[in-house]
């Protein structure tokens, strides 16, 4: 975890950890939504960890490039860390770009023991075949600009649960760009856990 900004809640005797992976933009773990996911998971008496990808530390808007090499390497470092901490049940909660990065990671390092939840699925960017054994849940806004929930269900398949957030966009905001549906997402996450 050297060189990474991260938040880590370690619940004593927990073998479950939730890795929260932020979406695009220059702000990662400091965003209100990622912080709220972290706090919500911690309240379930499970361990939680969220971290910034290096491009956030450099205050850059976007990832390291189309192959996401830096992000894959960082995620590998984080997963290695949680294994050394003794966790045997890992679930990744990935927002948007985090879902894309996760799919690239699993294409390079397949691991059926890690579960994946995607918040805001981007069909043309995610390597669906790489995550078919990992993906358990997608929470998609009804008005997501990348894909409607019904479209995502066709791509992800019947083994994946899809939760539609009515009237929400890709960031779970209303038409005025107010994040009023984010709490609904948090409630669904708690119910899923």
Regions picked out by a protein language model, each given a short descriptive name:
Residues 89-92, 116:
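Conserved alpha/beta-hydrolase fold motif
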Residues 101-105, 127:
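Hydrolases whose catalytic domains are alpha/beta-hydrolase-1, hotdog thioesterase
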Residues 111-123:
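A conserved short beta-strand
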Residues 132, 137-140, 144:
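Short beta-strand/loop motif that positions the catalytic acidic residue
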Residues 142-147, 170-171:
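Acidic catalytic loop of the alpha/beta-hydrolase fold
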Residues 168-182:
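Catalytic histidine-centered segment of alpha/beta-hydrolase-like enzymes
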